[in-house]
Amino acid sequence: MADDPSSFATDLWASLEAISVVRRYESGTLLFEQGESASGIYLIQKGQVRLWIPEGSGPIILARSVASGTMLALSEAISEGTHKLSAMALVQTEAGFVPRETLMGYLREHHKICLQVVRTLSEDLHGLYHSFQRLNLAHPRSRRWQPDGGTQ
C-alpha cells in the first residue's frame, strides 16, 4: 500500500524543520537573490515571500507569492547550484534555514527522508513540465525550436 501523500509531506517537513535554524525577515528583505550560490534551504513557517526572475534591468519574467508551508531552494542546495530566482519577504516572515552541509549530512544518515526529498524533487519536475505544457497550449506555436538550433 502506498504512503499517504499528506503524511509523507508532513514527515519531510517535520524532519527538516527539526534541523533548521529560524531566521526572521522584515518586509522587503531579500532571502536570496538570483545568481547567488545556494547555501541551504528555506522552510517558510510564517509570512509571505515574493519569488521572481529578474531580467537584468528590464521587466520581471515571472512573479508569484508563496506562504507558510513552502520549501525554497531545495534543488539548488542539493546540486550545489546558484539560485534561479530571487526571493523577498512581503511581510514579516519566519523561515527555518537548513545549511547545505547540515542537509546533506542528515540525508546521508536518514535514508527515508532522502527518498522523500527525491520524491519532492521529482514532483517539482513534473509540475514544471505540466506548466510548460499549459504555456505551450496557451500560445500558438508560431516560433518552434528546432534541434539544429533554428526556429521555424
Listing of model-derived features with the role each one plays in the protein:
Residues 12, 18, 64-119, 126:
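Cyclic-nucleotide recognition modules
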